[in-house]
């Protein structure tokens, strides 16, 4: 059974795949990832909680299905080799009490008329982006001189600067802590002009041997390989 839906105590879940065996039903949570992450286990745990509380049928096992990144396609895809299928039964059973407690906490927050006091941080974007970023995060974060625009700066460091009242390039005093690229950003903003290092560009292009070809790994995002 694909996409079977269940609800218990206002908690709705949709199971990716259910398979009936002689020992009971096996539950499969399918992910387009190449490894199991902790929030995948909690996805499976909430499904386990709802199904156990409903007690409609016997559950034999629960699995998380991920992609095998060592798989190499040769004509027909072998699904057994293409997927990694791992039991997380012990994990979801261990998480059960925590999940029940978390549901109580979240229902309490949902019923309250007051917003929960939560600071902004990496948790706002991972594992999934929050829909209230425009409400909690600074209005100037997308401005060209916002510290949130620093190239390749860890999000925790950006937030640390912001919490210190340093929200724009002009307020950054510790220049030495920045990378050369980030310093260039500040200089380009200050001069209102791009920084073009022609000699550095020439050194790079002089090393290129023609004809040249490119293969962009990010062009294809399909989980199932298209080509052998």
Task: Report the location of each language-model feature.
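Short amphipathic alpha-helical face segments that pack within enzyme cores
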Residues: 42-50
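N-terminal accessory regions of nucleic-acid-interacting proteins
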Residues: 148-211
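Flexible loop/turn segments at secondary-structure boundaries
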Residues: 35-36, 71-72, 168, 220-224
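Extended, structured, electrostatic nucleic-acid-contact surfaces
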Residues: 131, 135-152
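Metal-dependent nuclease catalytic regions and adjoining charged, substrate-binding loops involved
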Residues: 35-38, 53-133, 137-138
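Conserved catalytic cores of phosphodiester-cleaving nucleases, focusing on short active-site segments
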Residues: 2-4, 13-36, 47, 216-219
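Short helix/loop capping segments that flank catalytic or ligand/cofactor-binding pockets
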Residues: 138-140, 159-161, 170-171, 222-225
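Conserved RNase H-like, two-metal-ion catalytic cores of nucleic-acid enzymes
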Residues: 6-7, 200-228
């Amino acid at each position: 059974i694909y996409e079977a839906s269940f609800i218990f105590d206002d908690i709705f879940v949709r199971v990716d795949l259910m398979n009936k065996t002689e020992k009971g039903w096996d539950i499969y949570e399918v992910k387009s990832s190449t490894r199991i992450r902790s929030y995948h286990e909690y996805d499976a745990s909430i499904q386990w909680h709802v199904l156990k509380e409903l007690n409609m049928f016997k559950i034999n096992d629960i699995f998380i299905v991920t992609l095998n990144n060592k798989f190499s396609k040769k004509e027909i895809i072998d699904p057994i080799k293409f997927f990694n299928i791992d039991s997380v039964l012990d994990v979801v059973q261990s998480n059960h009490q925590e999940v029940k407690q978390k549901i109580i906490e979240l229902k309490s927050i949902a019923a309250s008329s007051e917003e929960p006091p939560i600071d902004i941080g990496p948790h706002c974007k991972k594992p999934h982006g929050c829909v209230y970023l425009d409400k909690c995060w600074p209005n100037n974060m997308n401005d060209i001189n916002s510290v949130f625009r620093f190239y390749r700066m860890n999000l925790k460091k950006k937030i640390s600067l912001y919490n210190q009242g340093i929200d724009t390039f002009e307020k950054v005093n510790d220049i030495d802590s920045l990378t050369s690229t980030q310093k260039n950003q500040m200089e380009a903003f200050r001069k209102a002009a791009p920084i073009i290092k022609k000699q550095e560009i020439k050194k790079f292009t002089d090393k290129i041997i023609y004809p040249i070809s490119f293969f962009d790994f990010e062009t294809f995002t399909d989980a199932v390989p298209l080509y052998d």
